């Protein structure tokens, strides 16, 4: 429980950066930790639930316990705002979000909810990358838009997501519906053409990943299911027509575990990447027993949710390392979070992922972090691993004057691969995996030669972390990446040489010009969402601007929910059936909150 509450401290500040309780900030939260860890996490106090048990509670249950329950007297000097923040993090969403997110409260229910007869009868954007290669490239036929159409795009409808502040879940388009979710844990099925709402579903916690849809077997009347994960490590299958839960599986018990990358389906399996917030909690603490989380990929039976295999990026389980001067037990190895959606290569029975940094130093350096890894889709066996940045051991808050014994002696640069590898075939018949790293370097690895480096290209003059975060898109000739320093770059797939660069200036005073959200491509054009709330389109030929839209401007929502746009920093736009969709609102770092889904078409 002690280390769990320190995770809580960090994540409260991450998720609620503008909350009024920040006047008290760390002092009150650390005081809470000091009062509670003498019981929670103490084996001698058997009646006090540990961190894993607390993580299973709803935010309403946590809030009730600390306001009117058995421990409320111990927290009598903690403000109600802080209690709600604490309950919201432990529960993974806002208190009472379920009461607010119900589609029945909206003013625009769809007049009919027809059965889904086929997923191939209408254009779709399924999951994170639109197809198994994660190229984020929509074909001309499926897009229904040309580069010439882009300047004529107009807002068709806007939809507000109640109780949401971050538009985490990238819109999925299938069967004439839009499936989307947010930090509230609310999931919605919306009519693609009109924005009317079919149904809502309330997850246990916030949903940060794109939704995947596929046929499901052996589940009675349910013929198609939507799949997604939450920030408590749960994975769900929900009836795509009715919104009723079919199954739920917890793929990781670690209190800091979350599903960030979108699960991806193939045949009867669902492949789920697992990430963590542990690296953001441990570095600034002198009492956290760092560190025990290991990134993983789990293969589930898509029909039942049963786990088939699970592969950890770091194969060795954490063991006690040493104790600090104050007696805190430290652990390791740890790290290797998977922030991205797996790329599938069924012809070679391979799954490809980008891996995150290590959290702990080890006698023998970890070889599987900060790189690209191939895993057998059938068995979970690691086929090969190519590490691009060795010895990257990083925890948030380390460096400078920080003397926490959790911090590595040699703090690493934090050069995770946050984005999915893109599988492309070259004219000469060779295949490459194109992967953008946080240091602004794009790598091409050969999947057929144990991940050997084909080429690498540095996109910026000064290497710092966070240059490329959630990745690019690729057509047959080039890959396109947005940069957090401002700008879009085209890189030739054949040799890694830069084709063009277009700088971007912020459209909003006081807002950054960063382009951290994933890029989306159609033939002749790419789309990029910016920290300033501007959605932009560029020509793939030379990078000249084609169109832009300020998502922070005031709009009227079709469902009657008050909503506003904000920053765009992770999920990218999606395109299908002549329409463009994007969520606006992203708060990590210096981003602005938002709860708005926007749909555009040529009118």
PLM feature segments, named:
Residues 1-3:
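N-terminal secretory signal peptides that target proteins for export/translocation
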Residues 104-155, 313, 317-318:
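Blade/loop signatures of beta-propeller domains
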Residues 5-18:
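Bacterial N-terminal signal peptides
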Residues 18-32, 103-107, 111-112:
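Electrostatic cytochrome c docking/interface patches
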Residues 74-102:
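C-terminal capping alpha-helices of c-type cytochrome domains
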Residues 26-33, 37-74:
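Gly/Gly-Pro-rich "capping" loops immediately C-terminal to redox-active cysteine motifs
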């Amino acid at each position: 429980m002690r280390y769990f509450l320190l995770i809580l401290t960090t994540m409260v500040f991450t998720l609620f950066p503008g909350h009024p309780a920040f006047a008290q900030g760390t002092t009150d939260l650390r005081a809470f930790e000091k009062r509670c860890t003498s019981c929670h996490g103490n084996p001698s106090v058997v009646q006090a639930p540990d961190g894993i048990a607390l993580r299973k509670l709803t935010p309403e249950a946590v809030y009730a316990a600390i306001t009117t329950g058995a421990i409320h007297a111990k927290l009598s000097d903690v403000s109600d705002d802080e209690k709600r923040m604490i309950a919201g993090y432990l529960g993974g969403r806002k208190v009472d979000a379920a009461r607010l997110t119900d589609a029945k409260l909206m003013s625009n229910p769809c007049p009919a909810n027809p059965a889904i007869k086929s997923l191939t009868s209408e254009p779709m954007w399924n999951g994170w990358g639109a197809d198994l290669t994660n190229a984020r490239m929509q074909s001309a036929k499926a897009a229904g838009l040309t580069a010439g159409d882009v300047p004529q795009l107009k807002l068709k409808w806007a939809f507000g997501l109640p109780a949401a502040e971050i538009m985490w879940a990238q819109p999925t388009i299938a069967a004439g519906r839009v499936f989307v979710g947010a930090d509230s844990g609310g999931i919605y099925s919306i009519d693609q053409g009109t924005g009317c709402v079919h149904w809502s579903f309330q997850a246990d916690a916030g949903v940060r990943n794109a939704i995947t849809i596929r046929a499901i077997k052996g589940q009675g009347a349910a013929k198609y299911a939507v799949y997604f994960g939450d920030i408590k490590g749960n994975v769900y299958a929900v009836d795509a027509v009715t919104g009723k839960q079919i199954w739920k599986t917890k793929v990781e018990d670690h209190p800091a575990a979350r599903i960030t990358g979108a699960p991806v389906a193939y045949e009867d399996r669902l492949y789920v990447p697992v990430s963590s917030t542990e690296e953001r909690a441990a570095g600034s603490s002198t009492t956290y027993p760092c560190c025990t989380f290991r990134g993983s990929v789990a293969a589930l039976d898509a029909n039942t949710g049963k786990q088939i295999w699970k592969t950890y990026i770091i194969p060795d389980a954490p063991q006690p390392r040493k104790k600090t001067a104050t007696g805190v037990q430290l652990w390791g190895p740890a790290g290797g979070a998977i922030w991205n959606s797996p790329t599938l290569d069924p012809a070679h029975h391979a799954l490809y992922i980008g891996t995150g940094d290590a959290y702990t130093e080890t006698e023998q350096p970890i070889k599987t972090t900060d790189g690209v890894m191939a895993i057998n889709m059938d068995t979970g066996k690691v086929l090969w691993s190519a590490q691009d940045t060795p010895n990257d051991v990083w925890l948030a808050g380390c460096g400078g004057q920080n003397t926490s014994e959790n911090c590595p002696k040699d703090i690493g640069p934090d050069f995770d691969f946050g984005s999915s590898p893109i599988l492309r075939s070259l004219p000469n018949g060779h295949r490459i995996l194109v992967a953008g790293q946080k240091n602004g370097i794009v790598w091409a690895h050969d999947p057929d030669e144990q991940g050997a480096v084909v080429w690498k290209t540095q996109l910026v003059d000064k290497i710092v972390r966070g240059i490329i975060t959630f990745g690019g898109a690729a057509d047959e000739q080039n890959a396109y990446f947005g940069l957090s320093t401002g700008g879009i770059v085209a890189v030739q797939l054949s040799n890694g040489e830069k084709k063009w660069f277009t700088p971007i200036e912020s459209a909003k005073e006081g807002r950054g010009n960063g382009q951290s959200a994933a890029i989306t491509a159609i033939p002749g054009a790419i789309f990029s969402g910016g920290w300033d709330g501007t959605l932009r389109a560029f020509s793939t030929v030379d990078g000249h601007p084609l169109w832009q839209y300020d998502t922070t401007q005031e709009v009227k929502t079709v469902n009657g929910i008050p909503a506003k746009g904000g920053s765009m920093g992770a999920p990218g736009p999606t395109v299908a059936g002549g329409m463009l969709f994007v969520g606006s609102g992203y708060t990590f770092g210096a981003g602005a909150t938002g709860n708005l889904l926007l749909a555009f078409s040529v009118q």
